[in-house]
Every structure is written in C-alpha cells, then in structure tokens.
C-alpha cells in the first residue's frame, strides 16, 4: 500500500527517514516495522512564527518496497552517425542543449573556451592566492559555466513546471542528491556540482558527441546569410548549425556580433555589492530566536525587495553558510560573487544587494565618466559594467583585493576605518563605496538598506560588510531571436541560447533554454 501525506511537523521530526517513519506511524496508526520507505516529495520551512515548522509532502510505502525510481531516467542514444550541431559554451545552456540534441538523434560538438571543470579549479585558486586572473579559465569561463564554482543554486521562478522537473531529474541522473526534487529552494553545492558536470560530459562523449576544451569561437562561418559553423582559436573549424551559449561574461562575443552588424540590443541589468553578515546573526533574525538555528534547521536564508526612486532594489543569489569569491574574468577588474558548499556550513551569509539598471539610465550612470560608447549603443550597459569593475580594481589596490565598507557606515556616508572578518580570501581594503560608486546606485542602496532594517530588525548593522562590486547578475545584451524557431532574426542556423543571449537567469532556466534551442535545431 502507498499513502501520501501532507504534514506540518517540527524540524527535529524531519531530519531523517527514521524520524519520518515515526511521524507516519503516528499519523496513520501503522507500526514502524511495516513502513518500509518514506520519500519526501516536497519540503519547505515555515519560520513566520516563533514556533518553526517544516511543511512536507510524503509518500509512504506500507508493507511493500518502492517499484519506481526516485527520478525519471532519460535514455540517451548513440548519435555517432547523426547530423553535427556545434554548441558553443559548456555551461548549463550548452550542456543541456547537447543532451537534448542526443535525445533527438543529433550529434553535438561542444566547444568551450575554458578548461575542464577540474583543471579550471586550479586557475580559480590562483585568483585568490596570487591575484592572477586567467582570461579564459576563471569563475565565468570553463566547463560548467559561471554556476559550477559559484553555488550550484537551482531555484527558478520559471512557470514551466514540467521543464523544471525534467532538468532536476537529469541532474539527479548524473549524480545530484535527490533532495533537489523536494526542496523549495534546491541547491547542489559548489563541492558536488563538478562531478555532476563531468558525468554529463562523459555521457555526451559515450553517445558519440564531442567536447573540446580551450577552444574559443573567434568567428562564425556564414555562407549566403546562413551560419554553417565556427572558426576557433586553435585553427580548426567546426561545421553545423550553431547553438551560441557563451554566457553573460563573453564580452568579446557581443563585440564581434555588434562589429558585424548582427542585431543585438541592450538589456537591463542590476548592479551593486555583495553584503556579508555573520550567519549566526541571520539565523537569529530569520528564526526569531537567540540560539539561532540549533541542531535541526539549515542555515537561514533571506530575500528582500523594495522600490526606490522608480527602480528595484533587491537581494540576489543569497548564499547561506557561504563564501564571497572573486569573479573577475580579465585583468584590471574586480568583481565579486557568492557560493555555498552543499552543507552550507561556513560562518558567513552573503547576498548580492543590487539596483535595477535600465538601458536609458546609461547617461546618468556615466555623467562623471568618459562615455566609451554612445547612450544608444546596444553595448552601453556592458561599457558601464566594465568601467565600474575597473573602478573597483583601482579602489582595491589594483589587485584582487576588494574595496569594502561596513553597512551602517555606508548608509551614513562615513568611512570605515576597520572591517569585520570576511570569507573573501584575496582580502578586503577599507574604501568609501558611497563616494566612488555612482550615486544612482548608492543612493538607492542606502534607502533600500534602511527599509530592510525596518522590516527585519537587526539586519542593518555594522557587523555586516559591503564588498564591491556585484555586476554580473545577468547579460547586459540580448541577442535577438525568433520566438518560434529560436533562430537569430537575421541569420539562419544561429540559435542564441541561455543567459548570455539574454533569455535565462540562472542554471535551471538556462538549461531549459538549452533544451528549447536544441528542439529548434531539430526543426531547422
């Protein structure tokens, strides 16, 4: 017999399958020995009141073993003789495009400018240890994309529930914990995601596809208005329709398209800082108790949003129990991001705190700077990103040390003469962010912080530190494509894909878009 139950239970009752069996026994009157397996279908924490509960949907197998897997397996066929399709970029958009191509009988040829996920880790370590940024192998470029070493967060606002479930199932098939199928905010963790990515690559190769690292697309091969392949830095050309999944930091790709008058447009972004608190403080605030999360609750998260001066101010990519990391993709820039290991066990909580930026804001943002491009250029907000990242580098001492300021000092426009301990390993340098960042951003952040401090008592504190700058929240450019065919609006055979093309925001939505682009190629 199988029973499904929707329950509201205490955190200590939700910690293990054995404790859940006790709950099922209590609710059904069936003795624990007869309850063979309990699966968690959905799980979320309700911390709105002083007594905290866990909402769970359970499937209990009574007097029988499950005869169904916890997740649906996708069957991948041999495509050695299939039509080749070039996939540029091995982030979630590109990798899931490749897997879907295999399902559809097409042969993916994946080219990635960076290194494989293990080799890439060494270059990322050098950023913190020696302040050296490899322009082709860093937090943005390399197998797995920007998400591989910056959290592995799978939460999405996508309404395409079937598509989301498919992506999560595929992650489980390649080694992710099945907990991502149940959790309200699923998270693989930076420590676990690399192995999952390797497993996906091995599957692509097993099926007859190809994966080429340290192979950068330098040009599209265009014949009679149709993209038929790519030229690369290795001198080798790869032929076939092209899925362009290069990520939001591939600025050379945007410049290449713009220089050749291939239609793109400016897209809104958000910029700001990484805000870091002691995790214990966030636990106390969010769980409404002095002892924090105790033994049975996870590191607490938060989410804030406000409207200030006609623009959104909000938290972004919140990382409980995480670390702030250097995310520059070339020299002369400092960019920060956040990550969490699977256990979310560090002493710090961090989140992007960002202000919405629209293309029409460019002139105001750059009023004290020399404009690198015209205000009407599709590259305008990219130019703003670049200038702000360079300013951050200059104010951080022209290395990967990040300029930083205590939170209350920033709100009061005061210099911070010392800084709290931080997870950011290249180091912090006290700096007046309120002075050198654009007032368009800092003024809205100040008002946003005051509002967040009112709705969440204790959040606005000098125990928190702001670390500059957070600029890579999304692509500053959209590569225009047809809504039905997923092809570029003027170039047949080119399928702009994922976050870098301006059609996704995060791992899951990029993966969904990769699958849709693969289906577009199949219908081409």
Residue ranges of model-derived segments:
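Residues forming the flavin
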Residues: 1-54, 58-149, 153-524
């Amino acid at each position: 017999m199988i029973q499904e139950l929707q329950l509201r239970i205490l955190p200590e009752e939700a910690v293990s399958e054995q404790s859940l069996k006790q709950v099922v026994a209590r609710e059904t009157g069936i003795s624990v020995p007869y309850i063979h397996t309990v699966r968690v279908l959905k799980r979320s924490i309700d911390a709105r009141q002083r007594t905290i509960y866990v909402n769970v949907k359970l499937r209990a197998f009574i007097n029988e073993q499950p005869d169904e897997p916890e997740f649906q397996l996708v069957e991948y066929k041999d495509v050695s003789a299939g039509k080749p399709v070039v996939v540029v970029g091995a982030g979630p958009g590109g990798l899931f495009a490749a897997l879907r191509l295999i399902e559809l009988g097409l042969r993916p040829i994946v080219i990635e400018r960076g290194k494989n996920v293990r080799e890439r880790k060494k270059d990322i370590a050098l950023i913190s240890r020696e302040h050296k940024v490899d322009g082709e192998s860093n937090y943005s470029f390399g197998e797995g994309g920007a998400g591989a070493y910056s959290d592995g967060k799978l939460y999405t606002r996508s309404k395409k529930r079937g598509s989301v479930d498919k992506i999560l199932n595929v992650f489980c098939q390649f080694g992710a914990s099945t907990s991502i199928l149940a959790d309200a905010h699923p998270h693989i963790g930076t420590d676990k995601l690399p192995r999952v990515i390797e497993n996906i690559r091995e599957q692509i190769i097993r099926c007859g596809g190809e994966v080429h690292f340290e192979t950068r697309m330098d040009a599209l091969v265009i014949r009679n208005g149709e993209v038929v392949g790519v030229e690369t830095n290795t001198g080798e050309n790869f032929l076939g329709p092209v899925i362009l999944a290069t990520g939001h930091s591939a600025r050379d790709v945007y410049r290449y398209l713009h220089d050749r008058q291939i239609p793109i447009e400016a897209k809104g972004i958000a910029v700001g800082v990484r805000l870091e608190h002691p995790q214990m403080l966030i636990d106390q605030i969010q769980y409404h108790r002095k002892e924090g999360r105790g033994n049975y609750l996870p590191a607490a998260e938060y989410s804030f949003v406000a409207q200030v001066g006609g623009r959104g101010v909000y938290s972004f990519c919140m990382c409980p129990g995480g670390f702030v990391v250097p995310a520059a993709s070339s020299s002369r820039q400092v960019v920060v991001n956040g990550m969490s290991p699977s256990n979310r066990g560090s002493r710090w909580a961090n989140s992007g705190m960002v202000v919405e930026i629209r293309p029409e804001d460019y002139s105001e943002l750059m009023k004290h700077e020399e404009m690198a491009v015209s205000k009407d250029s599709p590259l305008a907000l990219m130019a703003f990103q670049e200038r702000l990242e360079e300013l951050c580098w200059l104010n951080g001492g022209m290395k990967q040390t990040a300029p930083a300021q205590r939170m209350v000092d920033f709100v009061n426009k005061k210099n911070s003469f010392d800084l709290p301990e931080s997870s950011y390993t290249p180091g912090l340098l006290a700096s007046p962010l309120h002075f050198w960042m654009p007032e368009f951003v800092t003024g809205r952040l100040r008002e946003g912080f005051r509002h967040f401090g009112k709705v969440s008592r204790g959040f606005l504190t000098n125990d928190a530190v702001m670390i500059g700058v957070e600029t890579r929240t999304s692509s500053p450019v959209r590569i225009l494509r047809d809504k039905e065919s997923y092809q570029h609006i003027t170039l047949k055979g080119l399928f702009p894909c994922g976050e870098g093309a301006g059609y996704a925001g995060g791992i899951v939505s990029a993966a969904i878009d990769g699958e849709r682009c693969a289906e577009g190629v199949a219908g081409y």
